[in-house]
């Protein structure tokens, strides 16, 4: 398994040298907000919405004191806008009041923030602090199963399995690359197996 994992990591690194988050942000709390908005929404849509949102509320304090209804108006096109707006304002208030205005750097503290689950917390830990992080979104879960790196569809279960086999220093970048690969090649329906660099390692393609 160790050799297989190393080969998969190398192939993904060659295809995507820059393992970057697709969300646009300038401040740590802006990434937290963008990730919250991305739930059940595309990164492209979030990136269309956030410039105006961040211009209207240019500081953490501005978000913490924001009228939730006004935030709703800015994020309406992201879906589930009422819940997302409530979480954004509440999370920013908690950052201001309990975390000295900074996004915390531990899983336990992050999970206390409204609207922040393990997927969001892992992304923040990996992108903001360079910590080992396994972001189990739908792409990661699907491809990990197809490659035989994990079994099951429960995010926490898949996260544990991937943590057990991925080198910690590679885990965050691996997940960013898997998302890109899932969008371009290993799609949910009609995956492009004919041009897949990971085909030699694919359990589903080999019929196992």
Over which residues does each language-model region extend?
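Catalytic cores of DNA base-excision repair glycosylases
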Residues: 2-208
């Amino acid at each position: 398994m160790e050799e297989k994992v190393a080969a998969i990591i190398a192939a993904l690194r060659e295809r995507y040298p820059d393992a970057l988050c697709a969300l646009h942000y300038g401040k740590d709390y802006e990434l937290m907000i963008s990730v919250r908005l991305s739930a059940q929404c595309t990164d492209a849509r979030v990136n269309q919405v956030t410039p105006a949102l961040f211009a209207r509320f240019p500081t953490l304090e501005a978000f913490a004191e924001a009228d939730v209804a006004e935030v709703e108006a800015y994020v309406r096109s992201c879906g589930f806008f009422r819940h997302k707006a409530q979480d954004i304002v509440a999370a920013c208030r908690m950052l201001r009041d309990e975390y000295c205005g900074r996004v915390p750097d531990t899983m336990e503290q992050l999970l206390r923030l409204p609207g922040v689950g393990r997927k969001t917390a892992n992304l923040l830990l990996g992108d903001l602090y360079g910590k080992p992080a396994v972001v189990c979104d739908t792409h990661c879960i699907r491809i990990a199963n197809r490659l035989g790196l994990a079994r099951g569809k429960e995010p926490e279960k898949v996260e544990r399995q991937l943590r057990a086999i991925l080198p910690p220093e590679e885990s965050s970048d691996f997940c960013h690359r898997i998302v890109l690969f899932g969008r371009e090649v290993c799609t949910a329906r009609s995956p492009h197996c004919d041009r897949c660099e990971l085909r030699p390692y694919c359990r589903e393609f080999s019929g196992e």
